[in-house]
Amino acid sequence: MKAEMHTNKGVMHIDLYDAETPDTVKNFTDLAKKGFYDGLTFHRVIPDFMIQGGCPNGTGTGGPGYNIDCETSAEKQHHDRGVLSMAHAGPNTGGSQFFICHSRTNTAHLDGVHTCFGKVTEGEDVIDTIEGGDKIEKIVIVE
């Protein structure tokens, strides 16, 4: 399964790890299909680390109103450049917030802690142009 993340800075094409992290991918795609992410901002941007979005409050404090379990035992659980991962406040507290890694340099400590559920395969340059407050225009799921 694939996703197209349309932002005000360009489009990122993402391969989703639906075989490895089925519950996380289902949650993400369900929210995307409902338009949950449309118009939300990247509220947290840390250079050489990651860009984070998916908070309906725009502050990092919101979510969809429920939590999902982590799926961190799959094979593709390395936070490399372009990897899409679920943000959370502790084990099994993810919901809608996600982050995309800038590089492997500062992310190894996240392996096995946060669920990696996809990777940007095209439009990787967009990651580097995103700034705090930039918008997710829409996320299109391609099955």
PLM region descriptions:
Residues 1-143:
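Cyclophilin-like peptidyl-prolyl cis-trans isomerases
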